[in-house]
């Protein structure tokens, strides 16, 4: 079983029609292999628009592939910046935004970064889709509170940082 299988099952999400099956590699190898697989898929599908989310290597690979092909790219979660060039995700964010035809920013701060990079004319403030997803699944998570592992005390407060 793959790590992603649990998300498909738990949240009732259909499995993707296309899975490139790239797996973990160095940033360069992973990005290159995704670009190769995406190029073939995009040419076959011939979409009107391509949507890329976030700041992962797959996001950057999608942006570069679209910039070399006749496909328009919209970046969801655009404009986020840490101003830390040591983070690989920071490069992915900046390059993806500059390759994109349309930018959907989650915050006012993200919009400001995009304006500073002369990308304001193609940027739109849309809110944070991760918060939307959390609100969507919150009720199903709350219903499953009785199924907590015995080691978790429901009367205690916990902090969880989740990066998907």
Describe the function of each predicted region.
Residues 9-12, 67, 140-142:
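Short, solvent-exposed amphipathic alpha-helical segments in soluble enzyme
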Residues 7, 19-118:
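Active-site and donor-binding regions of nucleotide-sugar-utilizing enzymes
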Residues 1-2, 21, 99-161:
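A nucleotide-sugar donor-handling region in carbohydrate enzymes
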Residues 1-16:
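N-terminal glycine-rich anion-binding loop in soluble enzyme alpha/beta folds
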């Amino acid at each position: 079983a793959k790590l992603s299988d649990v998300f498909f099952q738990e949240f009732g999400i259909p499995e993707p029609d296309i899975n490139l099956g790239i797996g973990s590699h160095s940033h360069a190898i992973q990005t290159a292999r995704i670009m190769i697989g995406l190029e073939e898929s995009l040419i076959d599908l011939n979409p009107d628009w391509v949507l890329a989310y976030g700041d992962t290597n797959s996001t950057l690979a999608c942006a570069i592939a679209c910039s070399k092909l006749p496909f328009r790219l919209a970046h969801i979660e655009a404009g986020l910046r840490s101003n830390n060039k040591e983070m690989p995700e920071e490069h992915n964010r900046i390059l993806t935004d500059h390759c994109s035809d349309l930018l959907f920013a989650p915050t006012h701060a993200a919009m400001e970064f995009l304006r500073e990079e002369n990308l304001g004319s193609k940027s739109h403030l849309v809110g944070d889709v991760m918060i939307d997803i959390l609100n969507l699944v919150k009720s199903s998570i709350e219903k499953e509170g009785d199924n907590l592992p015995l080691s978790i005390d429901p009367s205690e407060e916990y902090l969880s940082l989740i990066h998907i």
